[in-house]
């Protein structure tokens, strides 16, 4: 008798991707975050769909429609807070996923890595346009400040900003198109995720030892399905605790005030997951320079496969690069903290130092430590 999952044209694809997929036997819990990101994406699409049924993308009613969802819709408050805090969980998983990729040298699978960078940019774009939708003070001013950065582009900047706004300021046209973008982008992300998985399954997964694991593979199901299930349960528990006990802890108090173009908040800042990039943007006095640094802060991830000269895969047996890696993580946390602080001394100075350190570590220190460790091996 033929096994249906191995012969059916559609089930065969699922079987090769999630059931009979040969997987290294030693991958640790740090490899769980890929599946957790998939779950986060599904949660966001489902909760977002139900929110879109009640939300109105009009400047006069957007704020009150969000209030209506929380007060009058059955479990609307839960759907709204799961969606808002689900975004935070998404980015926590995303940062850990990228961090693991850097630590264990997953960037050598360059196609998968580069699609991952595109996914990172797309997710950031989705989160940004989504943050604007509740039409609170920070939503409005965040949209105004960040879109205005495009005016730094020589010659076409001002025209480009007015084109994105749909007028001469952030208004009804802007909100409507941002809602349209926010609705379509998660499906574009889903398409890129499939390409990401396609490239990954072409080469096979990396593993903590950094050695070739072809001689030691096990089927994905049941070993890693059970392991992923545990991760998913922990993620859902963390998300539920966040959404039910501390729903507004990661939000901004200014967003409880409806958008007012005549009143600027004291400190304009984006959501916490953008603060590191925002700190890099603010640390450069020149507008165009700041925008380029902002883009480079993520795009520099593409440099990892190019700058890697190490004879060893991953950092597990490389103490010098390990130290530099953890310095990089600490520096990233400092940037995140500084991004949320007001623009005054000593934060401006510390932000500029942390921004320079961020790029120096990736471009200079990591390749240098690779060379040093290669020479130590030769001794």
Swiss-Prot record:
It is found in: Mitochondrion inner membrane. Binds 2 heme b groups non-covalently. Its main location: mitochondrion. Its cofactor is heme b. Signal peptide: none annotated. Heme 1 (or BL or b562) is low-potential and absorbs at about 562 nm, and heme 2 (or BH or b566) is high-potential and absorbs at about 566 nm. One of its GO terms (molecular function) is metal ion binding. The chain crosses the membrane at residues 33-53, 77-98, 113-133, 178-198, 226-246, 288-308, 320-340, 347-367. This is Cytochrome b. The keyword Cell cycle does not apply. It comes from Necromys amoenus (Pleasant bolo mouse). Keywords: Electron transport, Heme, Iron, Membrane, Metal-binding, Mitochondrion, Mitochondrion inner membrane, Respiratory chain, Transmembrane, Transmembrane helix, Transport, Ubiquinone. Coiled coil: none annotated. Heme b b566 binds at residues 97, 196. SUPFAM superfamilies: a domain/subunit of cytochrome bc1 complex (Ubiquinol-cytochrome c reductase), Transmembrane di-heme cytochromes. InterPro entries: Cyt_b/b6_C (IPR005798), Cyt_b/b6_C_sf (IPR036150), Cyt_b/b6_N (IPR005797), Cytb/b6-like_sf (IPR027387), Cytochrome_b (IPR030689), Cytochrome_b_C_euk/bac (IPR048260), Cytochrome_b_N_euk/bac (IPR048259), Di-haem_cyt_TM (IPR016174). GO terms for cellular component: mitochondrial inner membrane; respiratory chain complex III. Belongs to the cytochrome b family. GO terms for biological process: mitochondrial electron transport, ubiquinol to cytochrome c. Pfam families: Cytochrom_B_C, Cytochrome_B. A ubiquinone binds at residue 201. It is a multi-pass membrane protein.
